A protein has these predicted regions:
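Short N-terminal segments immediately surrounding and downstream of signal-peptide cleavage
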Residues: 1-25
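Alpha-helical protein-protein interaction elements
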Residues: 6-7, 48, 78, 89
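Extended hydrophobic/Leu-rich segments
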Residues: 9, 31-34, 38, 82, ...
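Generic signal for short, ordered secondary-structure residues
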Residues: 13-14, 46, 102-103
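Short N-proximal segments of mature Sec-exported proteins
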Residues: 20-77
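Compact alpha-helical subdomains of small soluble proteins
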Residues: 64-145
């Protein structure tokens, strides 16, 4: 990992879902990172592997609004300002992930091999699943009332 990437691309798998529930700042950071990571992989794979790319795109798009909601809860700003700040941070972090993965591709002939990216993708998928389950269970409770 270069010093540029080391500062901007951080392993997400050190955290657990319970920690996310207890800390809005951490929740925001992780969701933003998951959106950025999935966006970066979407960009890197879309030409050679369009079907694979689509699944990363779907995860990024699914998580995207939850990052905005979490940031608006933290910052208590109007929606347009929060959305702009979030979009700027995601774009910047996506570029950082792409740079990191391309550097790794040169070193290891793989964008992911020899890194924590695969583990982080699994962690991001766990977060998406937890959100989906929570929404599903909430809807079930609402329909019973």
């Amino acid at each position: 990992m270069t010093s540029l990437s080391a500062d901007k691309v951080e392993r997400l798998g050190f955290y657990n879902l319970q920690e996310l529930l207890e800390d809005d700042n951490l929740t925001y950071k992780i969701i933003r990172s998951c959106v950025s990571l999935n966006s970066a992989i979407t960009e890197i794979t879309k030409e050679d592997h369009p079907e694979l790319s689509k699944s990363f795109f779907e995860t990024a798009n699914y998580l995207y609004p939850f990052g905005i909601l979490t940031l608006s809860k933290i910052k208590k700003m109007n929606y347009k300002d929060v959305e702009k700040e979030y979009m700027d941070k995601v774009s910047s972090q996506t570029a950082d992930y792409m740079h990191f993965m391309k550097e790794n591709g040169v070193t290891n002939q793989s964008f992911i091999k020899g890194t924590f990216i695969g583990d982080d993708l699994n962690f991001c998928n766990e977060i998406r699943s937890a959100i989906e389950i929570t929404i599903s269970e909430t809807n079930k409770l609402k329909s019973k009332n």
